[in-house]
Amino acid sequence: MDTDFARSRRRDLIVAFVLAAIAAVVPLFVKDVYVQNIMVLTLMWGALSQSWNILSGYCGQISLGHALYFGLGAYATALLFTKFGVLPWFGMIGGGLISAVIAMALGYPCFRLRGHYFVIATIVIAEIGLLLFHNWDWAGAAMGIDIPVRGDSWLKFQFTRSKLPYFYFALALACVAWFVTWWLEDSKWGYWWRAVKDNPDAAESLGVVVFNSKMGAAAVSAFLVAVGGSFYAQFRSEEHTSELQSLV
């Protein structure tokens, strides 16, 4: 039997598809480079907001430390490319996996905290990460990393003559982040997360493993945020701790 919730989800999917199709043709009419840059960053932030929404919106764990995972993704891609010649695509996946693992490692102690204690812990962790990168000479310390530009190439994910490739990748990233969130909403994980958000004690009594649910949300959220950070590093062709500080 068709339910209001199912109809609402189908409607959301159709609306999202229409909006994505409209967004895809906008750059054909908007030629100003500055405006294109704004559109790219808007889509990137849209993807990041969906990533944050998984942990903080659905699971109810308010994190103010996601700048750490953003920075990990950016630095992983930049360091692997500049130091070892690893293509940004592999750095993007690697940065996401590293961030997911670190998110779970940090979540092990932090998810034993609740409320404002957890929020404060996420801020402290982000600040510690900022200080580590700020003083890590191999990663450029306070000077950051300048990514060498080696010509327009999808393989190296670098474009100088046009911002359109970045725009369409950012659009794809935003769509993927939204779709992952949309799909998870009606999965068992989505139900667990909402139960944990509403009342963790009641959820535990009904068989939901609260701690594992939080860890899963943290891993998925951190992975997507790190991919956004990797994209940002390639888009800017540099990475500096000052940008992470502004996020914190």
Task: Go through each PLM region and give its residues.
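Transmembrane alpha-helices and adjacent helix-loop boundaries
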Residues: 1-242, 246
